[in-house]
């Protein structure tokens, strides 16, 4: 899903929550948008290039061209159940973590809707443990 969609939806939820949480509502925006940095981290690891704009262009061009299958099996650490569990635990210890987790959940929801209706599939590797075990088994 394109970053602007995550931005718009996260901004809308942040605006709704602003009267309650004030400026901290910006953490919803951070949680809803910044977790896609793991796409960049994977690109940098896989292609040995640290160019953010090249990574962005790569994902925009290749995902749709390959019918949204070129990202199957990649590890997106911020899109894992373990990261979500960590954020849920941390959300009990501060408003900022709580609001970030709201943005994160919104991001996951938008990704799930996109994957189901547009890419016609569900998330492939939703767990860090699953990804490590699967890749370790495949290498043996």
Residue ranges and their predicted role:
Residues 1-140:
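N-terminal membrane-targeting hydrophobic helices
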């Amino acid at each position: 899903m394109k970053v602007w969609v995550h931005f718009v939806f996260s901004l809308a939820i942040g605006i709704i929550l602003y009267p309650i949480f004030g400026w901290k509502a910006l953490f919803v925006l951070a949680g809803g948008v910044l977790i896609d940095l793991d796409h960049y981290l994977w690109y940098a690891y896989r292609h040995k290039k640290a160019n953010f704009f090249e990574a962005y262009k790569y994902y925009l061009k290749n995902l749709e061209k390959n019918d949204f299958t070129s990202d199957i099996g990649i590890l997106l650490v911020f899109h894992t159940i373990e990261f979500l569990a960590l954020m849920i635990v941390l959300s009990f210890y501060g408003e900022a973590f709580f609001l970030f987790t709201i943005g994160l959940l919104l991001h996951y929801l938008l990704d799930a809707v996109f994957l189901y209706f547009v890419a016609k599939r569900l998330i492939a590797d939703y767990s860090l443990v699953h990804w490590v075990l699967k890749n370790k088994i495949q290498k043996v």
